[in-house]
């Protein structure tokens, strides 16, 4: 019955993006039934069943990219692949369309039922085999002989498929040639068999997407894609290439049919892809040059390959097929292989291997597929290579040196006297060739076969070459150097010729000398010329009818057979027709075939078709590097290298070393002989050298021939040595002759700087000033005035040629004659040592301060306030009281002064006191010392993590543990006081961490004790970091509102805002404003003018800093700013406040004032209009302006000047600022400096004892 009308049901794509397929344009063609052809076709072109069933089924196609690469290391290459993301296309009933478009995909539904092996490529086009044409490949092509040489549909350029006569109706935008590989997937419905169930099956394919990355050394495998098609069990699946990268036509096809309905319900799996090798190396299964692309093992080993593999290489198995193509079907038992050029399709069918579909076949030429074989046609200027898979460009033979030996140092030795071509050199006795010492390829490799296709001892004669490729239709190609190629008609043969093998005849290389008569490999019939010359070599083939592959019905396992049925062939006796069919062997006829019994030295072809010579040289019987093995018919010969001799033993011929050192006196009397494999070496004794003779010997060296041997005397030669007869000093011989006086003054300037006077046998020097003669009087040397020590005393003396320079040290100055340094008496200056005794020293002075005083600035003695300098003095059980030049401790009750009166100690110390450590996390945890004289309870019940002395630390017990409650029964922050007992139980007291640990826990802040614990208060602009135990600067620049439209720079306790001119920073608005905006800003400061004339000109600028408009006009100003803005009349402006409504947030929040208000000490109100405020600012107040000082400053007694506050003196009485450190006052602030012998640790910044190195 006819199929459904129109196109088959389409595919609904549901795609996911994948990296490797995102840019790939794939063409998916789905045939949902043989009856899906276009209407109006002939009746024979329509299917008869199964289409409707498949159209109702839902199927799915999954594309899984696999990206492969090749890694080579030390000559070993390995391929590895990685799985990419999947893409899925789903088709089901009810979504019929001609074209579906997705991201990176073009989906076309094809309604054509291509017949006779045709493959659907688009909506209206079939790719037909060479023997058929027509829209559906239903019409046999006229003259289907493969050798017609025509350009019709039967002969495609790159494969065996051709399109019908109808033009393709591809949708707009589709390209015939693409840089990507385009494949078609066909799902074809078959009639369901009896008893088959509905479960779906799936088929998998692994196809290449395009060429791999090619470099100068490594050719990476191309990326591949794994295609999985889920389909009903009655359907079959085919995948074939529509277009390859930069191709001009169809490239290849792959077919996969589902398994017959068997005992195994598991779906078929995709066979892996690997590398196909055509040659093998000695002791290795594979060669070094595989085909560029990936192939299946059955395609490789069933056609041109000898080995196949993926990460490892394996030799191809021997084919088990022993049948001969004769009339009628040829049956073999189950498990038998298909013949050469075919692969098994199922248990009863063999399918032709399309060698042209293998990547890299017939490079630089055209590949033509034949049933069971293929053909390579090379363009002019190219010839078929020995591997028969590529065309090689003809190049003129260059002649150069031929070397017979290559040393272990990669140096070429023993060149031949005549120049040879690389082929003549490497195919005979040469080991390297050319001026660059190019090594000859190893025997048996692909490179060796490339230049020596006939093996060692043979070379190609360019006068006559015969290239023969035998397939289903035999043909020969003759190349003539003197004329165009002439086609040769071959006789028809009743059977297929044996496959090619790597022998001289099968390579098509004739080893006989040139002859005048043209003859082919099969010399049975004369040749005829039937066509004029053409630019390409013409192919002449024997016509052969098409081969039909008939599928036999299913038979029992014992009767299953493989059938390949060629038609119109008569049965013949090959042994009788061709007596030399086996070559070097005897042909034995059989009932259905013949076999060959080969002679000694020959082996049977793998297909048992004829005898080929055994190449004994592959095993290197002559020895590596010892000789050249020449393979002969049935045997071999050894041509030993120099230094080796021929040895004939039970194991055959070989080359053994020749010991030349057995010959006496081989190296002469001046040396000895050392034998090496293949050569010998003469080692000469000292005083002898090797003479370049044949053979080389050691001869005496006449050292006296060299004039430099005895430059100062006469030379006398001796065997192996020489003797010099010295001349008198000042005399010299001329080449061993008489001794003559040497004029030293004429040979140079030995007395420079000075004058030379020649004397008999010597000379004399008169030196210039600053130089003196040397001890021998033969040269002038510089006088080192600095070495004598008489100049530059108390300075650095630098010697110069003929003189010297003085550089005085600190405390010295240069004398008038600039020859010495004189001391500077610093005590002559009154300010050198104020309050102390000045003692002048050489180059410096000393200021000795009385006891209890210290030197300030190196010039002033000041009383040391030990109590403020070290707040920890007398703590924790006493108070420090400063004295002039000393201090004393006032101890608490229960404590007494120490002997030095500088500390308080308990009358009785029931507890030991040691150091308290903060944590063990520091790299050097010994530096994290909180206190140095505390009990274990005071340490571990408060902030301590360990307690001990000198880094012998006892960890504090874990909080809430039994040990902790035993040590700290009252909890964190409390300790027991044994002096206070309530009801027999010691009372607890709070631990004052601020006194116990001081600045170690509240750095840069004020510590306030609480019960329990403590609080650390920081200055404005700082915050307390509980991990660092210190006040850390606040980065105001992190707040974008602080410096809008400007560049914010964080400072310690504040920040700066840099504006781009002419913009200015507005503190009130915390942003950069333009001049127009600043004009109306209340905080803008400019010059204040004391007078303003009637003409609007301002004059008399007021002294002091710039003021705002309000500050200027509320005082004595009459004009303001560079534009001389007039001030309003007194009492009329609203900008001058009448009551105190302002507050200074700085003074309200500054902890440094300790309760002092600016109204009391830091401001000055003036009743008059004038306000004098040096280093501060005037603020208008009722009754007059007030002088206010910035942070860190206070008003002096005059109330008109801001002076710096000495925080170290006023605020560090109890060590609130710098505990255990030295406080240094700065302008507006202060800083803490560690005492001598201490250094600041990280990360807490505490001062710890400096380690001695």
UniProtKB/Swiss-Prot annotation:
Main location: secreted
Superkingdom: Eukaryota
Annotated glycosylation sites: 86, 346, 842, 933, 1225
GO biological process, one term: positive regulation of mesenchymal stem cell differentiation
EGF-like domain ranges (all copies): 106-138, 352-392, 571-612, 613-656, 657-699, 741-781, 782-822, 823-861, 863-905, 990-1032, 1033-1072, 1204-1231
Record key words, sorted: Disulfide bond, EGF-like domain, Extracellular matrix, Glycoprotein, Growth factor binding, Repeat, Secreted, Signal
Family matches, as InterPro entries: ECM_structural_protein, EGF-like_Ca-bd_dom, EGF-like_CS, EGF-like_dom, EGF-type_Asp/Asn_hydroxyl_site, EGF_Ca-bd_CS, Growth_fac_rcpt_cys_sf, NOTCH1_EGF-like
Protein location: Secreted; Secreted, Extracellular space, Extracellular matrix
GO MF annotations in UniProt: calcium ion binding; transforming growth factor beta binding
Gene Ontology cellular-component annotations: extracellular matrix; extracellular region
Ranges annotated as biased composition (Polar residues): 1138-1148
Claim: Glycoprotein is one of the keywords in the record: yes
Modifications after synthesis and translation: Contains hydroxylated asparagine residues. Two intrachain disulfide bonds from the TB3 domain are rearranged upon TGFB1 binding, and form interchain bonds with TGFB1 propeptide, anchoring it to the extracellular matrix.
Signal peptide segment: 1-38
Region annotation Disordered: where it falls in the sequence: 244-270, 475-555, 1138-1169
Disulfide bonds listed in the record: 110-120, 114-126, 128-137, 276-300, 286-313, 301-316, 356-367, 362-376, 378-391, 402-425, 412-437, 426-440, 427-452, 575-587, 582-596, 598-611, 617-629, 622-638, 661-673, 667-682, 684-698, 745-756, 751-765, 767-780, 786-797, 792-806, 808-821, 827-838, 833-847, 849-861, 867-880, 874-889, 891-904, 916-939, 926-951, 940-956, 941-968, 994-1007, 1002-1016, 1018-1031, 1037-1048, 1043-1057, 1059-1072, 1113-1127, 1114-1136, 1208-1223, 1218-1232
SUPFAM superfamilies: EGF/Laminin, Growth factor receptor domain, TB module/8-cys domain
Domain TB stretches: 274-328, 400-452, 914-968, 1086-1136
The UniProt record lists the keyword Signal: yes
Subunit structure: Forms part of the large latent transforming growth factor beta (TGFB1) precursor complex; removal is essential for activation of complex. Interacts with EFEMP2.
Function: Key regulator of transforming growth factor beta (TGFB1, TGFB2 and TGFB3) that controls TGF-beta activation by maintaining it in a latent state during storage in extracellular space. Associates specifically via disulfide bonds with the Latency-associated peptide (LAP), which is the regulatory chain of TGF-beta, and regulates integrin-dependent activation of TGF-beta.
Family: Belongs to the LTBP family.
Protein name: Latent-transforming growth factor beta-binding protein 3
Record organism: Mus musculus (Mouse)
